[in-house]
């Protein structure tokens, strides 16, 4: 690509097509190891205020082969304007020359890499492929997770609990084409057969209060501020804890912060993938995300584009 060549800019649908979940999962596994080894630089995100309660989030990252920058605007008032609440792009650059290579849709990158990190955590922590997964939530994050988990664990039943039986049923009907084994949870009680629970809500108070139990992995995704917790503090304190990004988790993992956990006893996903973590006992995986995972998504897109050109 020369300096005068047009820069490819991909919309949400095209971005999703470049980020197939199996490929994204494999790239994320390598990125987790690279980040832990200091081979990916991923500073804490910069938050800049916008008008009407909005914020601009700047999240750069760099490695030897690629540099990326996610710039996302979150504007809570956009719903009333008929606009998306979250807007933004992830741009990829040559790590040596700084030349821009392509741009991806920011919310799509975030949604898909977040769901892929959950799948990676389940693979690493659960051992055998799960048979029954419960998704708590019926929003966009739940939709991304339904598609991702159906792709990675095609034999698993995906149960859904929403704020009502009707919302869960409507969600399943809307997304069953992407996740054929999607079913609404029958009642409020969580069956003993559920071996993985994933919380995917915007609730600031616990939506999961079950006692910690061996054989059931709990994954917290929705809470992303220090004062919000989807998982009951007693459940958190009784579990062995793993986070995707230890640096970010200390500021953003509200489930753990509210429970006042001892951070010396919190392991990283890199520890698990590296084989230094004992998976016995009740397990809880908290995902907060970081720019290194966006870089992994850009690596996946880069490789997909190269395969298209070669084919």
Swiss-Prot record:
Optimum pH is 6.5 for Pyr2C reduction and 10.5 for L-proline oxidation. Pfam families: OCD_Mu_crystall. It catalyses: L-pipecolate + NAD(+) = Delta(1)-piperideine-2-carboxylate + NADH + H(+); L-pipecolate + NADP(+) = Delta(1)-piperideine-2-carboxylate + NADPH + H(+); L-proline + NAD(+) = 1-pyrroline-2-carboxylate + NADH + H(+); L-proline + NADP(+) = 1-pyrroline-2-carboxylate + NADPH + H(+). Its EC number is 1.5.1.1. Disruption phenotype: Disruption of this gene leads to loss of growth on T3LHyp, D-proline and D-lysine as a sole carbon source, indicating that this gene has dual metabolic functions as a reductase for Pyr2C and Pip2C in these pathways. On the other hand, there is no difference in growth on other carbon sources, including T4LHyp, between the wild-type and mutant strains. Catalyzes the reduction of both Delta(1)-pyrroline-2-carboxylate (Pyr2C) and Delta(1)-piperideine-2-carboxylate (Pip2C) to L-proline and L-pipecolate, respectively, using NADPH or NADH as the electron donor. Can also catalyze the reverse oxidation reactions, albeit at a much lower rate. Together with LhpH, is involved in a trans-3-hydroxy-L-proline (t3LHyp) degradation pathway to L-proline, which allows A.brasilense to grow on t3LHyp as a sole carbon source. Also appears to be involved in D-proline and D-lysine metabolism. Does not show ornithine cyclodeaminase (OCD) activity. Belongs to the ornithine cyclodeaminase/mu-crystallin family. Homodimer. This is Delta(1)-pyrroline-2-carboxylate/Delta(1)-piperideine-2-carboxylate reductase. It comes from Azospirillum brasilense.
